[in-house]
Curated annotation (Swiss-Prot):
Pfam families: PMSR. Coiled coil: none annotated. The gene is msrA. InterPro entries: Met_Sox_Rdtase_MsrA_dom (IPR002569), Met_Sox_Rdtase_MsrA_sf (IPR036509), MsrA_MetSO_reductase (IPR050162). It catalyses: L-methionyl-[protein] + [thioredoxin]-disulfide + H2O = L-methionyl-(S)-S-oxide-[protein] + [thioredoxin]-dithiol; [thioredoxin]-disulfide + L-methionine + H2O = L-methionine (S)-S-oxide + [thioredoxin]-dithiol. Signal peptide: none annotated. Has an important function as a repair enzyme for proteins that have been inactivated by oxidation. Catalyzes the reversible oxidation-reduction of methionine sulfoxide in proteins to methionine. Belongs to the MsrA Met sulfoxide reductase family. Its EC number is 1.8.4.11. GO terms for molecular function: L-methionine-(S)-S-oxide reductase activity; peptide-methionine (S)-S-oxide reductase activity. It comes from Clostridium acetobutylicum (strain ATCC 824 / DSM 792 / JCM 1419 / IAM 19013 / LMG 5710 / NBRC 13948 / NRRL B-527 / VKM B-1787 / 2291 / W). One of its GO terms (biological process) is cellular response to oxidative stress. This is Peptide methionine sulfoxide reductase MsrA. PANTHER family: MITOCHONDRIAL PEPTIDE METHIONINE SULFOXIDE REDUCTASE.
Length: 162
């Protein structure tokens, strides 16, 4: 089982989206790559902790290649927007790909270079090793499953199983 962490705006929609992809085994939302210990949602929203709202993904690499997972990620973010996705603004809403396995970096960078060809503006998505990850509060986990009419910056048609 492999792991990758994606930040792409509000983590509710990011988690719901990746749960529709065959080969994704587990997801959880939380706070990635910040500079305090055990932050709360309220802490992260102050814009002072350095954390990104993120989705931690475990996937079966025999069934789902990292390239396909990253391609899916690019479909639901605007990687040229700094600290913003949809109506959400702030450093916690930045885009980021945080890797656990150093060997994944080459695949991530190749995908970013390919994606850059679609844009005139530079891609500002962070690509960094995962420094730390803290689980978000329980009410955030699988939020859109519990609240189907909840806010989501990702189009609803992309949240159907595929």
């Amino acid at each position: 089982m492999k792991k990758i962490i994606f930040a792409g705006g509000c983590f509710w929609g990011v988690e719901a989206y990746f749960n529709t992809i065959d080969g994704v085994l587990n997801t959880k939302v939380g706070y990635a790559n910040g500079n305090t210990e055990d932050p709360t949602y309220e802490d992260v929203c102050t814009d002072s902790t350095g954390y990104a709202e993120a989705c931690y993904i475990e996937y079966d690499e025999k069934q789902l290649k990292l390239e396909k997972l990253i391609d899916a990620y690019w479909k639901v973010v605007d990687p040229t927007l700094k600290n913003r996705q949809g109506h959400d603004e702030g450093t916690q809403y930045r885009t980021g790909i945080y890797y656990v396995d150093e060997e994944d970096l080459k695949v991530i960078l190749e995908s970013k270079d390919k994606e850059q060809e679609k844009y005139d503006a530079p891609i500002v998505t962070e690509i960094l090793p995962l420094k730390n990850f803290y689980d978000a509060e329980e009410y955030h986990q699988k939020y859109l499953d519990k609240n189907p009419n909840g806010y989501c910056h990702i189009p609803k048609e992309l949240l159907k199983k595929h």
